[in-house]
Curated annotation (Swiss-Prot):
Protein name listed in UniProt: Transmembrane protein 270
Region (Disordered), start-end ranges: 229-265
Keywords of this entry: Membrane, Transmembrane, Transmembrane helix
Lineage: Eukaryota, Metazoa, Chordata, Craniata, Vertebrata
Organism for this UniProt entry: Homo sapiens
UniProt cross-references to InterPro entries, sorted A to Z: WBS28
GO cellular component: membrane
Amino acid sequence: MEALPPVRSSLLGILLQVTRLSVLLVQNRDHLYNFLLLKINLFNHWVSGLAQEARGSCNWQAHLPLGAAACPLGQALWAGLALIQVPVWLVLQGPRLMWAGMWGSTKGLGLALLSAWEQLGLSVAIWTDLFLSCLHGLMLVALLLVVVTWRVCQKSHCFRLGRQLSKALQVNCVVRKLLVQLRRLYWWVETMTALTSWHLAYLITWTTCLASHLLQAAFEHTTQLAEAQEVEPQEVSGSSLLPSLSASSDSESGTVLPEQETPRE
């Protein structure tokens, strides 16, 4: 399906070129007619030359056209054509002559072999049967070679497919191993992050609790110190009152004792 746009573009280009050439031919039809007339004249001259060669006459000036004989350019053109005609004829007629010679030689060789076989007492039917048997054997050998090559190609294709499948399986195994390793790494990273996050949360909560306990203890200590500082002046005032009270009680007891001793005296 992907090769359709290039084919269409090439077809469009060919059609455009054909239309351009047709337009140019229509525009230059006079030159085309002159060229065709020249080709026809050259072909007629070549045919007449072949006829003259077949007859054994080489009188070129007798069969030249009147215009070519009068014009020096035409004479030079005909002279050049006469020089080129022999190699062109050899090129054109050489393969046909070679084929005719080969065919004649093979035909003569075949006739000579047939005459020799007939002289030896071997008929043509025997040789045809032998040739057909050899041909059948060659056909069987060719068929066997084709079958063997087809089987070898099939085996090689299967081997290539097996190698490709093994490579694909190896790649899949490697990919699976990599995926397993990546999964393990992911789980390890996830567990480590979870543990570190939980440890961090525990550490943060423990530090906050410790700080709160320390602050509470410091607050209680400060309150106790404040209460102690408030209680100390009261104790100092109470201790100062106790000696005065003891002194007053002693003085009262001293006054009472002499009064009690006087009657005894």
